[in-house]
Amino acid sequence: MLEKNPVISVKNLNKEIGNHRILNDISFSVCSGEILGIIGHSGSGKSTLLRCLDFLISPTSGSISIAGFHNSSAKEKISRSDFAKRVAYISQNGGLFLAKTVFENIAYPLKIRYPEMTKSLIEEKVNEALHFLNLYERKHAYPSRLSGGQKQKAAIAIAIVSDPQVLLCDEITSALDPRSTEDITDKLLQLNEERGITQVFVSHEIEVIKKLCTHTLVMHQGNIEELGPADKLFLNPYSSITEELFHMNSIAKGIYDHNENEEILRLGFPKGLAVQGMISQLIQGGQISINILSGDINLFRKIPLGFLIIVLSGEKKLRDRAKDILIGKGVIVQKFQKSR
């Protein structure tokens, strides 16, 4: 996420409300075409950070640069209309006008931001967005007649009709059923891959983060706990908070009483290794045994990544040899400490 001129740059950002610090010395950057997922427990500061990026609230200190706009500029010099042409914010509730049809809702920002735009061009752009989101047949419907997924698609159409550089998405799939969530994330991924739209996505749904994000920022109590490529954080997390959020150690911790000739390992299989069988190679000869506690193959932006939690049994030198073989093949090997 290092680039001389990133689309988003945040440096030493702090936000305090009264005596309570919501954000503490936050620094990161997002390059063109990346999707950054922000995850963390409730109250960790995720949505506050996103609202700071959209200039909806002002930080106590620190700097934000996004799509050429800077929070250090005088507020009166930043036109909200100009800002919204480049940066679109999508909330959980969608923010549709109840008295306007889907078509009218999508056309409204174009009329406000581009008063010189012809009626025919507005209609062309709105219809293009409607077709992209598979909403054309609902263009004359009012929000009260839409499903939750359709409302959120309409909100995305409103966001993209002005061709923004950046999309800021705040828990936009949290109230949707699995099918609607899949439809929405497919469209967001398509926007990224085909149009190169940079995105920041706040979510507590880890499967959504896996599917969409190139990078993940883990927050805890207003601090950045961990930051890096999404697949690397999944396979080799540094922080226990990241482990917990990715649900990787719930089975192993505290449920297996192992002895001195056993150890619990987490094996991470990067792309290209997730579908290769290696375990059978290790147990040939019968000198060690492997008990699989859990495992899964996950798709990160369509790339398969796998992990296993195993109990490796045998003499220490044989276990060490087995681990060396795995590491030599590119497997990430981590040892669980026995729970107390």
Curated annotation (Swiss-Prot):
Its EC number is 7.4.2.11. Gene3D superfamilies: 3.30.70.260, P-loop containing nucleotide triphosphate hydrolases. Its main location: membrane. Residues 8-246 form the ABC transporter domain. Signal peptide: none annotated. It comes from the Bacteria. SMART domains: AAA, NIL. The keyword rRNA processing does not apply. InterPro entries: AAA+_ATPase (IPR003593), ABC_transporter-like_ATP-bd (IPR003439), ABC_transporter-like_CS (IPR017871), ACT-like_dom_sf (IPR045865), MetN_ABC_transporter-like (IPR050086), NIL_domain (IPR018449), P-loop_NTPase (IPR027417). It catalyses: L-methionine(out) + ATP + H2O = L-methionine(in) + ADP + phosphate + H(+); D-methionine(out) + ATP + H2O = D-methionine(in) + ADP + phosphate + H(+). PROSITE patterns: ABC_TRANSPORTER_1, ABC_TRANSPORTER_2, METN. ATP binds at G40, H41, S42, G43, S44, G45, K46, S47. The keyword Oxidoreductase does not apply. GO terms for molecular function: ABC-type D-methionine transporter activity; ATP binding; ATP hydrolysis activity. It is a peripheral membrane protein. It is found in: Cell inner membrane. GO terms for cellular component: plasma membrane. The complex is composed of two ATP-binding proteins (MetN), two transmembrane proteins (MetI) and a solute-binding protein (MetQ). Part of the ABC transporter complex MetNIQ involved in methionine import. Responsible for energy coupling to the transport system. Belongs to the ABC transporter superfamily. Methionine importer (TC 3.A.1.24) family. PANTHER family: AMINO ACID IMPORT ATP-BINDING PROTEIN (PTHR43166), METHIONINE IMPORT ATP-BINDING PROTEIN METN (PTHR43166:SF30). This is Methionine import ATP-binding protein MetN. It comes from Chlamydia felis (strain Fe/C-56) (Chlamydophila felis).
